């Protein structure tokens, strides 16, 4: 894998689709429809280095993005990238409003309660429609599901990767 500084992971090529060179990408971005739209510039991170690609077409199919890159005409040209991650350049990320965060800013953050007691580490983000839910891995306990709502999340320090929550009664049971 190459140096990914100033690049942000937006998905992983999990398989090919059909014989015309489409790939199935498992997206890990809030903005998948923008990341994989026609003309979007992406980078495939391979063992040999980062390969720039441009999206020719894309569509959502069974919770995966089916993407065809410009210049790819058959499965043999793309199969070698199965399992590789897909990135965008950091300059392609728009500024977010206050209290909005990119997944990579939240994942691997430590979660503490109002007294500073460690609850766990965010390992995944689940989109529910109304609000995101952060899945927090706890030592020796089942994962905690933390809703991203003002009543619960009190502060997020992106630089320190530290999230403070108000552990409302029953939230961590």
From Swiss-Prot:
Main location: cytoplasm
Chaperone as UniProt keyword: yes
Subcellular location: Cytoplasm
MF terms (GO), sorted A to Z: ribosome binding
GO cellular component, one term: cytoplasm
Domain PRC barrel, residue spans: 98-171
UniProt keyword terms in alphabetical order: Chaperone, Cytoplasm, Ribosome biogenesis, rRNA processing
Biological processes per GO annotation: ribosomal small subunit biogenesis; rRNA processing
Pfam families, sorted: PRC (PF05239), RimM (PF01782)
Record's function text: An accessory protein needed during the final step in the assembly of 30S ribosomal subunit, possibly for assembly of the head region. Essential for efficient processing of 16S rRNA. May be needed both before and after RbfA during the maturation of 16S rRNA. It has affinity for free ribosomal 30S subunits but not for 70S ribosomes.
Recorded domain comment: The PRC barrel domain binds ribosomal protein uS19.
Family of the protein in this entry: Belongs to the RimM family.
Subunit composition and interactions: Binds ribosomal protein uS19.
Protein name (record): Ribosome maturation factor RimM
